Amino acid sequence: MFKATCNSRDFKKVINATSNLVDEICFEVDETGIKASAMDPSHVALVSMGMPKEVFESYEGDIHDIGIDLEALKKIIARSKGDEKLILELDDEKNKLNVTFKSNVTRKFSIALYDVSSSNLKVPDISYPNQVSIKAGAFVEALKDAELVNDHITLKVDEDKFVIYSKGDLNQSETVFENNNDEYETLTEFKMSEPSKSTFNLAYLKDLTKSTSAEDILKIYLGSDMPVKIEYEVSGSKLVFLLAPRIES
């Protein structure tokens, strides 16, 4: 069985962040909570989410793989209002996920499930030389600046600085965040073992940060020509994204 109750606002944020990159996913449900991982159709990005049972007001779950049409779920969750209670319940007999919103009224939906099993995808255990933690709002603004110049972006760590830049045929954009020299405390953590530089598809970075709030803290793990790993939390739930670099000749 599976039945869980939570705040609809928090669940919406997790689903929106995940569905920005993938259309369907397998929820791996057990007594500890919900987890899921999936690759985007181009196999450029991997998304992983984890919602431990502690983030739910109530939670009952044994081992199930629940194949979800994320786009359908996203549209239903978008109908939530304010801090409505959200109840998710698996109907094994009808092979559906029931979604209920509770406030002064009760609204019910059901979603047909895919017959899928766990992909067994895991976020690779990669050792990164560098890590920066940055407010999401500042990172997103730097992406918007870079978008004016090119559709690729370079993330660089060097000399106590985190640099985001983009270069076109004629124009260039650069945003520099200096460690220990930021009155707005935009960088909350900076760990550098060696200089690094990698280039990424800008559209993917926009998608995986689209659902963040300005004050969310992004943990960004970097190395030269390595996939970038970005982590952040939503009220106790954890989101992890891995994006392959663009290898320049």
UniProtKB/Swiss-Prot annotation:
Highest taxon listed in the record's lineage? Archaea
Write the record's keywords in alphabetical order, separated by commas. DNA replication, DNA-binding
What Pfam families does its record include?
Answer: PCNA_C (PF02747), PCNA_N (PF00705)
* PROSITE patterns named in the record: PCNA_1 (PS01251)
Query: CDD domains recorded for this chain?
Result: PCNA
State the Gene Ontology terms under molecular function. DNA binding; DNA polymerase processivity factor activity
**Entry annotated with the keyword Membrane:** no
Q: Name one GO biological process term.
A: leading strand elongation
Q: Which family does it belong to?
A: Belongs to the PCNA family.
Q: What does this chain do?
A: Sliding clamp subunit that acts as a moving platform for DNA processing. Responsible for tethering the catalytic subunit of DNA polymerase and other proteins to DNA during high-speed replication.
Q: Subunit comment for this entry?
A: Homotrimer. The subunits circularize to form a toroid; DNA passes through its center. Replication factor C (RFC) is required to load the toroid on the DNA.
Q: Which HAMAP family match?
A: DNApol_clamp_arch
Protein name (database record): DNA polymerase sliding clamp
